[in-house]
């Protein structure tokens, strides 16, 4: 069996010999806390272990505190374009954040997010897509990325 590091997201352990956790994402406006809590409770009833919400502005980030109080699942904040949203999400109780370092404004901003996450013990999922990778890197690594993404066949 391949070794993997255990990461704690709320009270759910990922990796190592732990069971596979089911994660889903809401499609409500996160600042609409009543609708978001209702949908998360439905996801929990369907067997979801972790839930992710979009944090598009500071009102979404501020809503995380109320949402956390109304649910029993670990809460992941999906951050786009602004490092301040990541910091606010962590400070409002996110159990994990998902960022794309290519679109939150440079190394200094990424460092600020990392420092905040470390101070609060919050893990970060790094999600990068080709739209946020500088063209010179994309062209240099395109072939190897295609090779990596191809499934291995026996």
Positions of the model-derived regions?
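Hydrophobic or amphipathic alpha-helical targeting/insertion segments
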Residues: 84-125
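Active-site beta-loop-alpha junctions enriched in small/polar residues
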Residues: 25-27, 54-58, 80-84, 100-104, ...
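Structural preference for beta-strand elements that scaffold enzyme active sites
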Residues: 19-23, 50-52, 74-76, 96-98, ...
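Residue-level detector of conserved catalytic or cofactor/ligand-binding positions
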Residues: 144-154
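Alpha-helix-loop-beta-strand connector modules within alpha/beta enzyme cores
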Residues: 58-77, 113-124
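Active-site mouth loops of central-metabolism enzymes
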Residues: 19-35, 54, 73-81, 137-145
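N-terminal amphipathic alpha-helix/helix-capping segment at the start of soluble metabolic enzymes
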Residues: 1-24, 118
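Glycine-rich, proline-tolerant flexible connector loops at the mouths of alpha/beta enzymes
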Residues: 27, 32-33, 44-66, 101-106
């Amino acid at each position: 069996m391949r070794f993997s590091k255990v990461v704690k997201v709320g009270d759910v352990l990922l990796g190592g010999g732990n069971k596979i956790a089911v994660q889903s994402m809401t499609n409500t406006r996160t600042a609409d806390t009543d609708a978001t809590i209702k949908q998360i409770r439905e996801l929990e009833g369907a067997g979801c272990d972790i839930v992710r919400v979009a944090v598009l502005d500071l009102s979404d980030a501020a809503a995380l505190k109320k949402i956390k109080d109304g649910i029993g699942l670990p809460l992941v904040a999906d951050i786009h374009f602004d490092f301040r949203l990541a910091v606010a999400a962590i400070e409002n109780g996110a159990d994990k954040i998902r960022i794309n370092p290519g679109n939150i404004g440079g190394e200094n901003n990424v460092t600020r997010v990392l420092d905040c996450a470390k101070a609060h013990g919050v893990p970060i999922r790094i999600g990068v897509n080709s739209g946020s990778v500088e063209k010179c890197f994309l062209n240099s690594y395109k072939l190897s990325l295609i090779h990596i993404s191809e499934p291995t066949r026996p």
